[in-house]
Amino acid sequence: MILLKLYLTLAAILCQSRGTTSLDLDDLMTTNPEIQNEIINKHNDLRRTVDPPAKNMLKMSWDNTIAESAKRAALRCNQNEHTPVSGRTIGGVVCGENYFMSSNLRTWSFGIQSWFDERNYFKFGFGPTRAGVMVGHYTQVVWYKSYKMGCAINLCPNEPLKYFLVCQYCPGGNVVGRKYEPYAIGEPCAACPNNCDNGL
C-alpha cells in the first residue's frame, strides 16, 4: 500500500512537470533562426484563418533591419507608449508596432496568439464590440499590406510586467479611415491568384 501511494505521488509530480515549460530569456532571442521561424509561421498561420476570409492577405517574412528597430524599442522599456513614428520609419516606410508584456516569461506564440485573440471583441467594418476593449493588436497582425516584420524581447527589471516583447510590421497597419477593415473580404488569394501560398 505504501509503495502504491509512493508510485501515485511520483506519477502526479511527473505529469505536472510535463505540463510546465522552463523558459530562459536566451531561448526567446530573435537572433535565433528557429525563433524567427516560430514568429513568422505563427503570424502566417493566423493570417490564413481570418473570418471573414481575406482575398488580399500578404505572406509575412522576417526582416533583420526591422528586428533591429524592434530591439531598440524593447530596450527603451517604455511600456506606456509606442515608439514615436520617427523611430519606426524604415526606408521611408512607417511601420506598425505591437507590445506584449508579462510578469512571467511566455513563448512568442503565446504573445502573438494573445494579440490575435482580440478578434473576439472585433466586428469587421465596425470595430470593437464593446467599450474599453483593445483590438488594434489584432488588426495589425492581420493587416493585409504588412508583409515584412521583425521582433525583439527584453527584460525590464524595474517594471511589474518585466518581460517585454515587441514586433514591428512594415508597412504599418491601422490606417486612419480603414482601421476596422484590415483586409478585403473574399476568396483567399483572389487578388493574387498567380502568386499564392496556401491562402497568402
Swiss-Prot record:
The keyword Disulfide bond applies. Expressed by the venom gland. Pfam families: CAP (PF00188). It comes from the Eukaryota. The keyword Disulfide bond applies. Disulfide bonds join C77-C156, C95-C170, C151-C167, C189-C196. One of its GO terms (cellular component) is extracellular region. It is found in: Secreted. Keywords: Calcium channel impairing toxin, Disulfide bond, Ion channel impairing toxin, Neurotoxin, Potassium channel impairing toxin, Secreted, Signal, Toxin. Residues 1-22 form the signal peptide. Its main location: secreted. GO terms for molecular function: calcium channel regulator activity; potassium channel regulator activity; toxin activity. Residues 41-169 form the SCP domain. Contains 8 disulfide bonds. Belongs to the CRISP family. Blocks ryanodine receptors, and potassium channels. This is Cysteine-rich venom protein VAR8. It comes from Varanus acanthurus. The lineage of its organism: Eukaryota, Metazoa, Chordata, Craniata, Vertebrata.
